Structure formats: structure tokens, C-alpha cells
Amino acid sequence: MPYKFTFDLSVVPHKFFKELAYMVDSKRIHKRTGRILRRLIDRFKLSELTGMDFAEILQVIEDLVDIQVKNLAYRQRFEMSKNKALFLPHCARKYVDSRCRAEFDPDVPTFRCRRCSPDCQVNQASRIAEELGYDVYIVPGGSCIPKIIKKHNYDGIVGVACGEEIRLAYTYLNEDIAAQAVPLIKNGCSNTVFSIDSLCKILQSQKI
């Protein structure tokens, strides 16, 4: 959890994210366009909804914009990639104790989902990705990802993580890898949350 604060954007109206995505897709916004972001934050009363300081919510939203911009930049190459993997954070499991039946493989390292909870986001995401032909890794941390990518020569990857971890990941991905990212909308050490709908749109995007 690289952020020095916790956040929960699951309370934010879906309309906010739709408007943010539209502004990025139509090239009407850039990460440094703080004035536009400040207006959006004020209009949707995000500080009041989330209980976060304005500076904290601004940092998170700036990271969301940066992720969306990078997704757009790499989208075409990602759609054409053939050997793909999905990396999920283990903290998004419904349970992070013995109630979770996932088996940990230290040689990879990854958790192997045993499908114990139908309403678990990791269960849902991994099932969808595997049906689409992705290799799936439920990782204990980001430091193991470069080794996995190198070993299997993936040319397209999808990562789910908090915005700051995603930003750090771009620093060790080489130019031969087309990456797409889905940011957490609720961070923390457990019970983190991401948008299954956003992930599915990325997973299903490919050139035939």
C-alpha cells in the first residue's frame, strides 16, 4: 500500500468516473490540468463523500487520469499482443485468512484460486481472464512481476493495483510490453476493491 493514506472511491457516483473517462478519451484533459480536476472534485463533493483531504483526493484522481492516458497510448499494441497475462493483487480476495482456499505456490510466486467464494472479485476476475486465454497470477506484491514476465515472454499484460503501484510498475516495464492497468478504487491491506466492468472491457479488447 504505497500511498500514505487509505481511500475508498466506491462511494463516488459512477457518473464521476464516466465523465473523467470521457474527458481523457476526448483529449480534453491532461494529468497537469489541475484546474479541471479541482472543479470536478468540488462539483461531485468528493472530499465530503470520501472523508479525504483535498490534496489526497487530488493525488488519487491525478493518478487515475495518468493511468487512463497510458492505457490509451498502449491500447492498440495491447489489442494485437498474443501472449497475455493478468496480475491481480492478493489483497482483493474476499478473505485473506484461512477462509480463503487459494493455494500459494512460492516457486512462481502466486496464489492459485480454488473458487471458494462466488462473490470474490479475484475469483470472478481470474475466471473471466482464464476463459479468454490469459495466464493469471494473484501476486503477494509487485516485486515478483518482472521475473514472471521475463520467464514467460509476455507481450501484453493487465495489472490491477493502486494508482501509485501502477505508476511505479511503468518504470520497470520495457517497451516491448504493452500494458493496461485497472486501478483500485478502494485501497488498504485487505478487502481492496476494483471495477470488474473496467477490467472486463480491457480483457476483452483484442484484434482478431
Question: Model regions: which residues?
Answer:
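A short, gly/pro- and small-residue-rich
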Residues: 106-108, 169-186
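Proline-aspartate-enriched helix->loop->beta-strand connector
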Residues: 153-154
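General beta-strand structural signal in soluble alpha/beta enzymes
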Residues: 137-140, 159, 181
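Ser/Thr/Gly-rich flexible loops in soluble cytosolic domains mediating phosphotransfer, phosphorylation
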Residues: 113-114, 180-208
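A short acidic (Asp/Glu
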Residues: 98-99, 148-150, 167-171
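Electropositive, gly/pro-rich neighborhoods at or near active sites that engage anionic ligands
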Residues: 1-93
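Gly/Ser/Thr-rich loops at beta-strand to alpha-helix junctions
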Residues: 90-94, 118, 142-145, 159-167, ...
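Redox- and metal-dependent alpha/beta enzyme cores, enriched for Fe-S-associated oxidoreductases
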Residues: 79-132
